[in-house]
Amino acid sequence: MRLELHQLSARHPAARPAAAPAIRDLALQIGAGEQVAVIGPSGAGKTTLLQVLACALPPSAGTFTVDAQSPWQLPRRALQRLRGRLFLAPQVPPLPPRQRVVTAVLAGRLPAMGLWQSLRSLFYPADIPAAFDALDRFDLADKLFERVDRLSGGERQRVGLARALLSPASLWLIDEPLSALDPTRSRQAIGTLVDTARERGATLVATLHQVDVALAHFPRIIGLRDGQLAFDLPSAEVTRARLAALYDQFEHELRGEVPVTAPGESSGQQPVVMHCR
Protein backbone atom coordinates (compact mmCIF):
# COMPACT_ATOMS: atom_id res chain seq x y z
CA MET A 1 0.00 0.00 0.00
CA ARG A 2 1.18 3.51 -0.81
CA LEU A 3 0.33 6.15 1.80
CA GLU A 4 0.37 9.90 1.22
CA LEU A 5 -0.26 12.74 3.66
CA HIS A 6 -0.44 16.32 2.42
CA GLN A 7 -0.34 19.11 5.03
CA LEU A 8 -2.37 16.84 7.28
CA SER A 9 -3.60 17.77 10.74
CA ALA A 10 -5.61 15.55 13.06
CA ARG A 11 -7.29 16.12 16.39
CA HIS A 12 -8.21 13.48 18.94
CA PRO A 13 -12.03 13.06 19.12
CA ALA A 14 -11.99 13.73 22.88
CA ALA A 15 -9.89 16.89 22.62
CA ARG A 16 -11.32 20.27 23.55
CA PRO A 17 -12.27 22.47 20.59
CA ALA A 18 -9.53 24.97 21.44
CA ALA A 19 -6.84 22.31 21.85
CA ALA A 20 -4.03 22.15 19.32
CA PRO A 21 -4.14 19.25 16.85
CA ALA A 22 -2.23 16.16 17.97
CA ILE A 23 -0.45 16.21 14.60
CA ARG A 24 -0.32 19.16 12.24
CA ASP A 25 0.88 20.05 8.77
CA LEU A 26 2.40 16.62 8.13
CA ALA A 27 3.59 15.91 4.60
CA LEU A 28 4.72 12.30 4.13
CA GLN A 29 4.86 9.63 1.46
CA ILE A 30 5.34 5.97 2.35
CA GLY A 31 5.79 3.67 -0.60
CA ALA A 32 4.41 0.17 -0.97
CA GLY A 33 6.70 -2.35 0.71
CA GLU A 34 8.62 0.16 2.83
CA GLN A 35 9.55 -0.47 6.45
CA VAL A 36 9.41 2.74 8.48
CA ALA A 37 9.93 3.48 12.18
CA VAL A 38 8.33 6.53 13.80
CA ILE A 39 10.16 7.85 16.86
CA GLY A 40 9.82 10.83 19.16
CA PRO A 41 9.14 11.71 22.79
CA SER A 42 5.88 11.01 24.58
CA GLY A 43 3.08 13.21 23.27
CA ALA A 44 4.75 13.67 19.88
CA GLY A 45 1.70 12.38 17.99
CA LYS A 46 2.97 8.93 17.05
CA THR A 47 -0.17 7.01 18.03
CA THR A 48 -2.40 9.65 16.43
CA LEU A 49 -0.47 9.23 13.19
CA LEU A 50 -1.10 5.49 13.27
CA GLN A 51 -4.81 6.10 13.88
CA VAL A 52 -4.92 8.23 10.74
CA LEU A 53 -3.03 5.60 8.73
CA ALA A 54 -5.42 2.93 10.05
CA CYS A 55 -8.40 4.84 8.61
CA ALA A 56 -9.67 5.18 12.19
CA LEU A 57 -9.29 8.94 12.60
CA PRO A 58 -10.21 11.37 9.81
CA PRO A 59 -7.94 14.37 9.29
CA SER A 60 -9.16 17.74 10.52
CA ALA A 61 -7.20 19.44 7.73
CA GLY A 62 -5.19 18.36 4.72
CA THR A 63 -5.53 15.06 2.88
CA PHE A 64 -4.70 11.39 3.39
CA THR A 65 -4.77 8.83 0.59
CA VAL A 66 -4.20 5.08 0.40
CA ASP A 67 -3.21 3.92 -3.07
CA ALA A 68 -4.39 7.31 -4.38
CA GLN A 69 -7.84 6.94 -2.76
CA SER A 70 -9.19 9.04 0.10
CA PRO A 71 -10.61 6.54 2.64
CA TRP A 72 -13.14 9.03 3.96
CA GLN A 73 -14.68 9.58 0.54
CA LEU A 74 -15.34 5.87 0.02
CA PRO A 75 -18.75 4.25 0.58
CA ARG A 76 -19.01 2.50 3.94
CA ARG A 77 -18.63 -0.99 2.48
CA ALA A 78 -15.58 0.02 0.46
CA LEU A 79 -14.04 1.58 3.57
CA GLN A 80 -14.58 -1.68 5.45
CA ARG A 81 -12.87 -3.60 2.64
CA LEU A 82 -9.95 -1.19 2.80
CA ARG A 83 -9.64 -1.65 6.56
CA GLY A 84 -9.61 -5.39 5.96
CA ARG A 85 -6.38 -4.93 3.99
CA LEU A 86 -4.50 -3.52 6.97
CA PHE A 87 -3.32 -5.01 10.24
CA LEU A 88 -3.22 -2.87 13.36
CA ALA A 89 -1.42 -4.00 16.51
CA PRO A 90 -2.19 -1.64 19.42
CA GLN A 91 0.00 -1.34 22.49
CA VAL A 92 -2.37 -3.62 24.41
CA PRO A 93 -3.57 -6.48 22.16
CA PRO A 94 -7.36 -6.93 22.42
CA LEU A 95 -7.17 -10.59 23.39
CA PRO A 96 -10.16 -12.20 25.17
CA PRO A 97 -8.73 -13.45 28.48
CA ARG A 98 -10.31 -16.92 28.38
CA GLN A 99 -9.42 -17.55 24.75
CA ARG A 100 -6.77 -20.09 23.77
CA VAL A 101 -3.60 -18.66 22.27
CA VAL A 102 -4.03 -20.71 19.09
CA THR A 103 -7.43 -19.09 18.49
CA ALA A 104 -6.11 -15.62 19.29
CA VAL A 105 -3.28 -15.95 16.77
CA LEU A 106 -5.46 -17.38 14.01
CA ALA A 107 -7.76 -14.38 14.46
CA GLY A 108 -5.24 -12.55 12.30
CA ARG A 109 -6.90 -14.29 9.34
CA LEU A 110 -10.45 -13.20 10.17
CA PRO A 111 -10.56 -10.31 7.64
CA ALA A 112 -10.17 -12.87 4.84
CA MET A 113 -12.86 -15.21 6.18
CA GLY A 114 -16.59 -15.32 5.64
CA LEU A 115 -18.99 -15.07 8.56
CA TRP A 116 -19.59 -18.81 8.95
CA GLN A 117 -15.90 -19.65 8.67
CA SER A 118 -15.07 -16.96 11.23
CA LEU A 119 -17.59 -18.30 13.74
CA ARG A 120 -16.44 -21.88 13.22
CA SER A 121 -12.81 -20.89 13.80
CA LEU A 122 -13.67 -19.78 17.34
CA PHE A 123 -14.37 -23.40 18.27
CA TYR A 124 -12.33 -25.36 15.72
CA PRO A 125 -8.99 -23.70 14.86
CA ALA A 126 -8.50 -24.17 11.14
CA ASP A 127 -4.71 -24.21 10.77
CA ILE A 128 -2.94 -25.17 13.98
CA PRO A 129 0.47 -25.71 12.27
CA ALA A 130 0.41 -22.14 10.94
CA ALA A 131 -0.35 -20.79 14.41
CA PHE A 132 2.48 -22.89 15.85
CA ASP A 133 4.95 -21.57 13.27
CA ALA A 134 3.93 -17.93 13.89
CA LEU A 135 4.29 -18.33 17.65
CA ASP A 136 7.60 -20.11 17.21
CA ARG A 137 8.99 -17.03 15.47
CA PHE A 138 8.42 -15.20 18.77
CA ASP A 139 9.58 -18.07 21.04
CA LEU A 140 6.02 -18.82 22.13
CA ALA A 141 5.36 -22.20 20.51
CA ASP A 142 4.99 -23.81 23.95
CA LYS A 143 2.04 -21.49 24.68
CA LEU A 144 -0.05 -22.72 21.73
CA PHE A 145 -2.92 -24.12 23.80
CA GLU A 146 -2.46 -21.90 26.86
CA ARG A 147 -5.22 -19.53 27.88
CA VAL A 148 -4.55 -15.85 27.27
CA ASP A 149 -5.21 -14.86 30.89
CA ARG A 150 -2.37 -17.13 31.99
CA LEU A 151 0.20 -15.27 29.91
CA SER A 152 2.47 -12.51 31.15
CA GLY A 153 2.17 -9.01 29.70
CA GLY A 154 5.14 -9.54 27.43
CA GLU A 155 3.80 -12.87 26.19
CA ARG A 156 0.42 -11.32 25.38
CA GLN A 157 2.19 -8.57 23.46
CA ARG A 158 4.11 -11.13 21.41
CA VAL A 159 0.91 -13.08 20.71
CA GLY A 160 -0.53 -9.86 19.30
CA LEU A 161 2.49 -9.51 17.03
CA ALA A 162 2.30 -13.15 15.93
CA ARG A 163 -1.12 -12.35 14.49
CA ALA A 164 0.56 -10.16 11.90
CA LEU A 165 2.36 -13.16 10.43
CA LEU A 166 -1.00 -14.80 9.66
CA SER A 167 -2.75 -11.66 8.50
CA PRO A 168 -3.52 -11.25 4.78
CA ALA A 169 -2.94 -7.49 5.16
CA SER A 170 -0.55 -5.58 2.93
CA LEU A 171 -0.16 -2.76 5.49
CA TRP A 172 1.03 -3.45 9.04
CA LEU A 173 0.65 -0.69 11.62
CA ILE A 174 2.37 -1.53 14.90
CA ASP A 175 2.02 0.80 17.90
CA GLU A 176 4.76 0.59 20.56
CA PRO A 177 5.14 -3.20 20.22
CA LEU A 178 8.02 -3.45 22.68
CA SER A 179 6.64 -1.70 25.77
CA ALA A 180 6.47 -4.97 27.75
CA LEU A 181 9.67 -6.56 26.43
CA ASP A 182 13.29 -6.49 27.54
CA PRO A 183 16.04 -5.51 25.05
CA THR A 184 16.70 -9.06 23.85
CA ARG A 185 13.03 -9.84 23.21
CA SER A 186 12.61 -6.41 21.63
CA ARG A 187 15.31 -6.94 19.05
CA GLN A 188 14.04 -10.43 18.25
CA ALA A 189 10.43 -9.28 17.83
CA ILE A 190 11.26 -6.31 15.61
CA GLY A 191 13.69 -8.36 13.55
CA THR A 192 10.96 -10.93 12.92
CA LEU A 193 8.42 -8.28 11.89
CA VAL A 194 10.78 -6.38 9.60
CA ASP A 195 12.16 -9.51 7.93
CA THR A 196 8.69 -10.98 7.34
CA ALA A 197 7.30 -7.71 6.00
CA ARG A 198 10.24 -7.42 3.62
CA GLU A 199 9.79 -11.01 2.42
CA ARG A 200 6.10 -10.43 1.70
CA GLY A 201 6.43 -6.93 0.29
CA ALA A 202 4.15 -5.57 3.02
CA THR A 203 4.29 -1.95 4.12
CA LEU A 204 5.30 -1.73 7.79
CA VAL A 205 4.98 1.38 9.95
CA ALA A 206 5.91 1.00 13.62
CA THR A 207 6.05 3.55 16.42
CA LEU A 208 8.92 2.92 18.81
CA HIS A 209 10.40 4.38 21.98
CA GLN A 210 13.50 2.18 21.61
CA VAL A 211 15.58 4.38 19.31
CA ASP A 212 18.49 1.94 19.13
CA VAL A 213 16.18 -0.83 17.92
CA ALA A 214 14.63 1.47 15.32
CA LEU A 215 18.02 2.50 13.95
CA ALA A 216 19.26 -1.09 13.84
CA HIS A 217 16.30 -2.61 11.99
CA PHE A 218 14.51 0.05 9.94
CA PRO A 219 15.95 1.63 6.79
CA ARG A 220 13.86 4.80 7.23
CA ILE A 221 13.21 6.84 10.38
CA ILE A 222 10.54 9.50 10.87
CA GLY A 223 10.99 11.79 13.88
CA LEU A 224 7.97 13.55 15.38
CA ARG A 225 7.92 16.21 18.08
CA ASP A 226 4.96 18.26 19.28
CA GLY A 227 2.85 16.86 16.47
CA GLN A 228 5.15 18.07 13.72
CA LEU A 229 7.72 16.44 11.47
CA ALA A 230 11.22 16.90 12.87
CA PHE A 231 12.99 14.78 10.25
CA ASP A 232 12.44 12.01 7.71
CA LEU A 233 15.73 10.32 6.93
CA PRO A 234 17.49 7.06 6.12
CA SER A 235 18.56 5.51 9.41
CA ALA A 236 22.25 5.98 8.54
CA GLU A 237 21.70 9.76 8.45
CA VAL A 238 20.05 10.07 11.86
CA THR A 239 22.86 11.66 13.87
CA ARG A 240 23.26 12.03 17.62
CA ALA A 241 22.71 15.76 17.22
CA ARG A 242 19.34 15.19 15.55
CA LEU A 243 18.30 12.76 18.27
CA ALA A 244 19.41 15.16 20.99
CA ALA A 245 17.26 17.90 19.48
CA LEU A 246 14.30 15.54 19.03
CA TYR A 247 14.42 14.39 22.66
CA ASP A 248 15.43 17.71 24.23
CA GLN A 249 14.03 17.70 27.81
CA PHE A 250 13.06 14.03 27.28
CA GLU A 251 16.59 12.63 27.50
CA HIS A 252 15.45 9.83 29.81
CA GLU A 253 13.33 8.43 26.96
CA LEU A 254 16.26 8.57 24.57
CA ARG A 255 18.36 6.66 27.10
CA GLY A 256 15.61 4.06 27.35
CA GLU A 257 15.21 4.30 31.11
CA VAL A 258 12.37 1.79 31.41
CA PRO A 259 12.31 -0.37 34.56
CA VAL A 260 12.46 -4.09 33.84
CA THR A 261 11.43 -6.43 36.64
CA ALA A 262 11.94 -9.86 35.09
CA PRO A 263 13.60 -11.38 32.03
CA GLY A 264 11.42 -10.73 29.01
CA GLU A 265 8.97 -8.45 30.83
CA SER A 266 8.54 -4.83 31.87
CA SER A 267 7.29 -3.29 35.09
CA GLY A 268 3.71 -4.10 34.08
CA GLN A 269 2.49 -0.60 33.29
CA GLN A 270 -0.51 -0.79 31.01
CA PRO A 271 -0.50 1.52 27.99
CA VAL A 272 -3.68 2.89 26.50
CA VAL A 273 -5.60 0.63 24.13
CA MET A 274 -6.01 1.95 20.58
CA HIS A 275 -9.08 0.77 18.72
CA CYS A 276 -9.17 0.94 14.92
CA ARG A 277 -12.91 0.59 14.35
What are these model-derived regions, one by one?
Residues 172-175:
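Catalytic Walker B motif of ABC-type/P-loop ATPase nucleotide-binding domains
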Residues 147-151, 155:
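Conserved ABC ATPase signature
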Residues 54:
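Helix-to-loop junction immediately C-terminal to a conserved catalytic motif
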Residues 71-87, 117-124:
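ABC ATPase NBD coupling module
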Residues 208-209:
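H-loop/switch region of ABC-family ATPase nucleotide-binding domains
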Residues 118-143:
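Conserved ABC ATPase "signature" region
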Residues 62-70:
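Conserved ABC transporter NBD signature motif
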